Design a protein with these regions (language model features):
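Phosphate-binding and adjacent anionic-ligand microenvironments
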Residues: 1-146, 152-176
């Protein structure tokens, strides 16, 4: 998110899933790309909604090829990626839904009533140094959870806070 802002873009959160990403690109001509944390990326300019890692790699190399080569003053490939933040995050954690989906999500949302959050795709809670996401799966009777911190200590702190708020209603032992 911060790299998008630093590059002059405007990040927008939408629901997880290919169909939602494709719809976002179709309905927003100013959006040059869409992506998911799972690694799926969609470039708008030539084939909107086309998600192929080989194609995206070729396009990335094409874009990099427009800049001067390192021996002509351009940055090395490794230098380009060194500018990208490398924040620790949990794996995607799947927790079986016990009880109703709406009731469980309402309980989770209430547990974070004092926090800044987004409900575009489940509940994404903002922390000063990271975030926590809890969303119902689109395809299974489970909750999908993730967390990210600026460093390992902040990630641990976020997980501990989440556990203190909802650990009594959900088994969060896999969220690490």
């Amino acid at each position: 998110e911060e790299v998008i802002v630093e590059s002059g873009g405007i990040p927008k959160m939408v629901r997880t899933g290919h169909s939602f990403m494709k719809k976002e690109l179709r309905n927003n001509p100013d959006s040059p790309l869409a992506g998911e944390m799972s690694g799926h990326f969609f470039l708008r300019d030539r084939w909107p909604g086309f998600d192929c890692s080989l194609y995206n790699t070729a396009r990335l190399l094409e874009m990099i090829g427009r800049d001067p080569a390192p021996d002509q003053g351009g940055p090395k490939f490794s230098e380009r990626f060194a500018r990208m933040p490398d924040y620790p995050s949990t794996d995607e954690t799947k927790i079986p839904l016990i009880g109703g989906r709406e009731e469980t999500m309402a309980t989770v949302e209430q547990a974070f009533a004092d926090m800044e959050k987004s409900t575009v795709d489940g509940i994404r809670v903002r922390y000063p140094d990271g975030w926590y996401l809890c969303r119902p799966s689109n395809t299974e009777p489970i909750l999908v959870m993730r967390a990210e911190g600026r460093n390992q200590e902040s990630l641990i702190s976020i997980i501990e806070d989440v556990n203190s708020r909802i650990g009594h209603i959900l088994d969060l032992s896999e969220l690490s």
